[in-house]
Amino acid sequence: MADLNKLLTPLFLNEKEIRKIIELMFFSYRDFTSGPDKILEKIKFGRAHHRVIYFVGKRENLTIKELLSILQITKQSLSRVLNQLVNEKYILLSIGEDKRTKKLILSKKGQELEKKLSDIQISNIFNVIKKFDEVDINGFKKILYKMIKKDNQKIFDDIN
């Protein structure tokens, strides 16, 4: 294991140190997504499906417009993934009161998949962060939050 003190030298945040952070993000994200990726691969889904299932599960009756705002993808990109999830009965589509708004809800099948995928990631995160104190964890969360662009921080705040 790399010596964390060698990885973290905040007084000398030069390009070399920033590149270490880039690499840490790459490797941690790769490992963070690897468990769910294996499950998704078995049902011929990918990370785009995972993101849609996650956010539809997080907020019941999420509109397509809201989902597009969260994911920041085009309607065309969402359409392919969403149609597959609806056709395979992971997501239920309902028409809003004004007949123009489409609302998304996870089906029982979708809830089960979302839980299965999230449980892996929650467990992975918990097994790491339980070794740190609240100050360290909040510092980590603060860094991640500040890496989000201002307008996207508002989206994050709205869903939390």
Where in the sequence are the language-model features?
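N-terminal helix-turn-helix DNA-binding core of bacterial DNA-binding proteins
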Residues: 34-77
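C-terminal regulatory/oligomerization modules of transcriptional regulators
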Residues: 1-13, 134-160
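A structural signal for well-ordered alpha-helices, especially hydrophobic packing surfaces
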Residues: 29, 114, 148-152
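Short amphipathic alpha-helix starts
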Residues: 27-28, 76, 107
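Charged, amphipathic alpha-helical coiled-coil/dimerization segments
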Residues: 33, 83-142
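N-terminal leader segment of winged-helix/HTH proteins
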Residues: 1-43
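Short, locally clustered residues in the helix-turn-helix/winged-helix DNA-binding domain
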Residues: 26, 54-58, 118
